[in-house]
């Protein structure tokens, strides 16, 4: 029986990986890539999986780093991107960095050589034709205007963003709750009935002024040339831009102190208050409300640790603002990465709201496997949320708690994983682990569990395929 091909739109990290996974499952795939007939503002070549920004895939340590764990999961799943990266590795300490030209040339050659892969150089302007019954849209942060507008028209204007304004995210366990407290402004209950939905960090006038001075003096990351024509919009101004408008601007904006009472010191009115809002269903990650920023990373950690309660903050993600195209995935996509309102379309990569090469490729890997299984008359469930890939797909398709307008791209990190308590909390001498040593032990346990559960998922996938 001749199988009808699956169409993949976009030959970046996610699209290349998706095409490889589909073909590896024995299903024909047509990969549509517009570069070659139409360029982008950022790409330099027409090669597949071209690395636009950094040449680093970040940490390759799968024992204590969530990025390394997703690397290892992708290796075990015959991931094209991660195995090719290893073949073109350049020295970078514990990170996996690649020779970018050799890497993209190798990806292109492997896909061109596969008998089930057809590469078509064309732009898909608008939604795919109706007779394409299985499509993966993996068009990345620089999705063409025509396709982006078609998706936006179908989903609704507020459900597709063209600029991500990322606020820092803090691990809950690193927040000093002896200084901070839980309370919603004016004790107003949210949809869940919770009147203590925010964590509040108070500042005196002296602390606020010192914070403001540091903020104004801090080094900032400049926009790339192809981002400069994307203006700020008022709802997502960088915090340092707000500060430049006047010393009181932040106190009447994201740091306003009204409607809140510090239970640690109830008779003293805070001069300013920084709020953090829960960012995932597990309650392990909290984002700094209104703190989107273009500050350089080192400056962010130094300055944000000036905030009372965040002196020892550990960041799951630092802030940033750059041009991007991404869906409000928790609202629009199901657990198979299909658009709920048009199930023939799957989405993969950065357009789903993941951030980074590795995360994009991982979502391409899953989308490709989901689509191939469906074409073969099977149903493949996502990996469990205890795995790196499972945690990431759970986050973008339902684990993100905040209002739809606040969904922003996310890197993989252990804060997305379910908590784990079954691990040794003592060292080899029986001494109780504390601080960073305890955190390291927990990460090791989470990494071990992730890879065990991922292997079990792969084994289950093989059983489904054999049925």
Swiss-Prot record:
GO terms for biological process: tRNA methylation; tRNA wobble uridine modification. It catalyses: uridine(54) in tRNA + (6R)-5,10-methylene-5,6,7,8-tetrahydrofolate + NADH + H(+) = 5-methyluridine(54) in tRNA + (6S)-5,6,7,8-tetrahydrofolate + NAD(+); uridine(54) in tRNA + (6R)-5,10-methylene-5,6,7,8-tetrahydrofolate + NADPH + H(+) = 5-methyluridine(54) in tRNA + (6S)-5,6,7,8-tetrahydrofolate + NADP(+). Its EC number is 2.1.1.74. Its cofactor is FAD. Signal peptide: none annotated. Keywords: Cytoplasm, FAD, Flavoprotein, Methyltransferase, NAD, NADP, Transferase, tRNA processing. FAD binds at residues 10-15. PROSITE patterns: GIDA_2. Pfam families: GIDA (PF01134). InterPro entries: FAD/NAD-bd_sf (IPR036188), MnmG-rel (IPR002218), MnmG-rel_CS (IPR020595), MnmG_N (IPR040131), TrmFO (IPR004417). One of its GO terms (cellular component) is cytosol. It is an enzyme of class 2 (transferase). It is found in: Cytoplasm. Transmembrane segments: none annotated. GO terms for molecular function: flavin adenine dinucleotide binding; tRNA (uracil(54)-C5)-methyltransferase activity, 5,10-methylenetetrahydrofolate-dependent. It comes from the Bacteria. Belongs to the MnmG family. TrmFO subfamily. Catalyzes the folate-dependent formation of 5-methyl-uridine at position 54 (M-5-U54) in all tRNAs. This is Methylenetetrahydrofolate--tRNA-(uracil-5-)-methyltransferase TrmFO. It comes from Hyphomonas neptunium (strain ATCC 15444). The lineage of its organism: Bacteria, Pseudomonadati, Pseudomonadota, Alphaproteobacteria, Hyphomonadales.
């Amino acid at each position: 029986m001749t199988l009808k091909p699956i169409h993949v739109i976009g030959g970046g990290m996610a699209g290349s990986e998706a095409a490889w996974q589909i073909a590896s499952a024995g299903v024909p795939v047509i990969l549509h890539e517009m570069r070659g007939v139409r360029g982008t503002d950022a790409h330099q070549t027409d090669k597949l999986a071209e690395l636009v920004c950094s040449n680093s895939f970040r940490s390759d340590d799968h024992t204590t780093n969530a990025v390394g764990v997703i690397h290892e999961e992708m290796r075990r799943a015959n991931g094209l991107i991660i195995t090719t990266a290893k073949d073109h590795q350049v020295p970078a300490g514990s990170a996996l960095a690649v020779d970018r030209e050799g890497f993209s040339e190798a990806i292109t050659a492997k896909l061109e050589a596969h008998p089930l892969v057809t590469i078509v150089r064309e732009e898909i302007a608008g939604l795919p034709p109706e007779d394409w019954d299985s499509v993966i849209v993996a068009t990345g942060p620089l999705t063409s205007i025509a396709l982006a507008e078609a998706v936006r028209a179908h989903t609704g204007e507020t459900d597709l963003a063209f600029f991500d304004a990322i606020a820092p995210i803090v691990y809950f366990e690193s927040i000093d709750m002896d200084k901070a407290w839980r309370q919603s402004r004016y004790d107003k209950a949210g949809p869940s009935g919770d009147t203590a939905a925010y964590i509040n960090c108070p500042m005196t006038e002296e602390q606020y002024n010192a914070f403001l001075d540091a903020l104004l003096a801090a080094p900032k990351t400049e926009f790339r040339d192809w981002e400069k024509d994307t203006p700020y919009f008022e709802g997502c101004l960088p915090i340092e831009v707000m500060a430049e408008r006047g010393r009181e601007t932040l106190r009447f904006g994201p740091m306003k102190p009204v409607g809140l009472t510090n239970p640690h010191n109830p008779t003293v009115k805070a001069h300013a208050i920084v709020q953090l809002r829960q960012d995932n269903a597990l309650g392990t990650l909290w984002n700094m409300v209104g703190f989107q920023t273009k500050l350089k990373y080192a400056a962010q950690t130094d300055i944000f640790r000036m905030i009372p309660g965040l002196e020892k903050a550990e960041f799951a993600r630092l802030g940033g603002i750059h041009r991007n195209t991404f869906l409000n995935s928790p609202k629009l996509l199901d657990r198979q990465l299909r658009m709920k309102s048009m199930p023939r379309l799957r989405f993969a990569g950065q357009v789903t709201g993941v951030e980074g090469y590795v995360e994009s490729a991982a979502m391409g890997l899953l989308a490709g496997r989901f689509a191939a299984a469906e074409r073969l008359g099977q149903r493949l469930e996502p990996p469990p949320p205890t795995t790196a890939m499972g945690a990431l797909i759970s986050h973008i398709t339902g684990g993100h708690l905040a209002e739809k307008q606040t969904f922003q791209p996310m890197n993989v990190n252990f804060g997305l994983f379910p908590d784990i308590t079954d691990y040794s909390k003592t060292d080899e001498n029986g001494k109780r682990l504390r601080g960073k040593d305890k955190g390291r032990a927990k990460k090791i346990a989470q990494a071990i569990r992730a890879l065990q559960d991922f292997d079990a998922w792969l084994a289950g996938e093989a059983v489904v395929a054999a049925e």
